[in-house]
């Protein structure tokens, strides 16, 4: 068995790498490439996302679980790996063929068609995506080093080959080849530990049904933000798709750092349920959920009040119109965070994933209907599509709560009260930001005045939030202060 502390550190560093590098390359690409060309890339990237799940067929999630169960049996490992690899290879070839047939028959500019063909590399490369084997073997140190090397190569390649506003094909080729190289490196590494063996059609038939079930569960979320981008790709200008994509990337690159805490606690919650220690389970959900909301709500509200500021810092002045989308995505991250707790820590961990899938599809159906209504009326503003997703997700949260209450899975009162309190405390950020904008008005360009405005807003909001937490004697805040004091005095002692 691998050292769990080393794995945890490697996994954390991996998450940081996956957040830091897009925050480096994103601003560069947004400033270098033309808005229309970058919009075409985002349209193409959205389109290939429709095919990739069918190429992988839920094998990633299924493979981790299947290999983890037989790690002590070499023959079983070889058989399971071979079975899943063969299925993945066939699915990838069929999906790639379907992709080319569809894109060949589609209308589009010559540049857009070229991007479709270049990005096909990412669809075809999916059969090499056996990272689930490395995760099952807990090879997190290898994944970390490989990811670091690949990301550095990607960074160098982007700076070397994407130099002018019309280098979009070069950018697409770099991203596609880097994706294939990433998968190939993992494939070559894992081949030292496994070998291919023959499998029967009976074995294939036996796993197809659970693979399809996992495919539906893992990709039901595509009916939300992904569906928005699909509709925008069809009815809006290319730059509108970029506005949506930039806002989504910016907000969830930041909130994604904190959200990892939710998934980390799932194994411990499952352990408590396994030994019937319901008090420990309830305490951990309440405490973990409260800490999560303590962090995510002020972060979300803070990003909302600085939406346009953050947008032009990240992507430049020409993407200022994405500021509204950033505000909406920032506000959306609060119900998203609540849903993450309800679904990952309560519903899923207690074995109600089938019911959860039904709820996802109900919410997705609502989003599909609302998006269709917008498209029918020729509404192409990305902000409206974000609003439809928020509406659908609020319905999902309501159904989550109904499921939890009907089956007596968890008492949500404390969690909801604390969520409401932190939202009330953080709402003062909007007043502070407004007052600062009146006292220190700015132009929407990146200059010293903008940076002063941002700094003043952040400092003022942080001081305000600390004062409020101190006045109400918030338990999380007090315990955090105490922990800091203990560490400081311990070092001095």
Where are these predicted regions, by residue range?
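Hydrophobic alpha-helical transmembrane segments
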Residues: 120, 145-192, 210, 361-369, ...
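Membrane-interface junctions at transmembrane-helix termini in multi-pass inner-membrane proteins
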Residues: 124-145, 331-362
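Alpha-helical transmembrane segments of multi-pass membrane transport and lipid-handling proteins
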Residues: 16, 53-56, 82-111, 118, ...
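Interhelical loop/hinge segments that connect adjacent transmembrane helices in multipass membrane
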Residues: 144, 168-172, 184-225, 230, ...
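Signature of the first transmembrane helix
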Residues: 3-60, 96, 155, 212-238, ...
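Helix-loop junctions and terminal segments of transmembrane helices
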Residues: 27, 56-72, 247, 251-289, ...
């Amino acid at each position: 068995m691998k050292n769990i502390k080393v794995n945890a550190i490697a996994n954390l560093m991996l998450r940081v790498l996956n957040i830091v590098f897009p925050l480096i390359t994103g601003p560069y690409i947004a400033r270098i490439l033309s808005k229309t060309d970058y919009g075409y890339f985002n349209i193409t990237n959205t389109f290939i996302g429709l095919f990739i799940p069918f190429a992988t067929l839920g094998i990633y999630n299924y493979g981790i679980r299947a290999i983890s169960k037989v790690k002590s049996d070499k023959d079983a490992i070889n058989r399971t790996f071979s079975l899943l690899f063969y299925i993945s290879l066939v699915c990838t070839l069929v999906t790639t063929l379907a992709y080319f047939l569809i894109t060949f028959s589609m209308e589009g500019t010559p540049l857009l068609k070229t991007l479709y063909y270049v990005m096909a590399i990412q669809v075809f490369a999916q059969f090499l995506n056996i990272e689930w084997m490395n995760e099952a073997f807990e090879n997190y140190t290898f994944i970390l080093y490989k990811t670091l090397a690949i990301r550095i190569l990607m960074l160098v390649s982007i700076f070397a080959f994407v130099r002018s506003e019309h280098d979009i094909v070069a950018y697409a080729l770099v991203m596609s080849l880097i994706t294939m190289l990433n998968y190939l490196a993992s494939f070559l590494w894992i081949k030292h530990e496994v070998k291919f063996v023959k499998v029967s059609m009976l074995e294939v038939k036996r796993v197809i049904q659970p693979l399809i079930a996992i495919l539906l569960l893992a990709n039901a979320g595509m009916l939300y933000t992904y569906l928005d981008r699909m509709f925008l790709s069809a009815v809006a200008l290319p730059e509108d798709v970029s506005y949506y994509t930039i806002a989504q990337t910016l907000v969830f690159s930041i909130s994604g750092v904190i959200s990892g805490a939710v998934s980390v606690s799932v194994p411990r919650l499952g352990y408590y349920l396994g030994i019937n220690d319901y008090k420990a389970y309830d305490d951990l959900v309440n405490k973990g959920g409260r800490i999560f909301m303590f962090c995510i709500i002020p972060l979300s509200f803070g990003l909302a009040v600085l939406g346009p500021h953050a947008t032009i810092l990240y992507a430049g002045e020409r993407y200022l119109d994405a500021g509204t989308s950033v505000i909406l995505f920032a506000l959306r991250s609060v119900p998203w965070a609540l849903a993450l707790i309800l679904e990952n820590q309560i519903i899923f961990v207690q074995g109600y994933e089938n019911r959860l899938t039904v709820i996802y599809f109900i919410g997705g159906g609502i989003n599909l209907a609302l998006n269709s209504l917008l498209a029918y009326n020729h509404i192409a503003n990305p902000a409206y599509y974000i609003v439809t997703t928020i509406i659908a997700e609020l319905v999902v949260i309501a159904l989550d709560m109904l499921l939890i209450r009907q089956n007596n899975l968890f008492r949500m009162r404390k969690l909801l009260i604390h969520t409401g309190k932190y939202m009330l405390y953080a709402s003062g950020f909007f007043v502070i930001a407004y007052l600062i904008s009146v006292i220190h008005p700015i132009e929407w360009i990146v200059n010293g005045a903008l940076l002063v405005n941002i700094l003043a807003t952040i400092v003022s909001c942080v001081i305000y939030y600390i004062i409020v937490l101190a006045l109400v004697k918030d338990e999380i805040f007090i315990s955090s202060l105490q922990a800091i004091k203990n560490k400081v005095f311990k070092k001095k002692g």
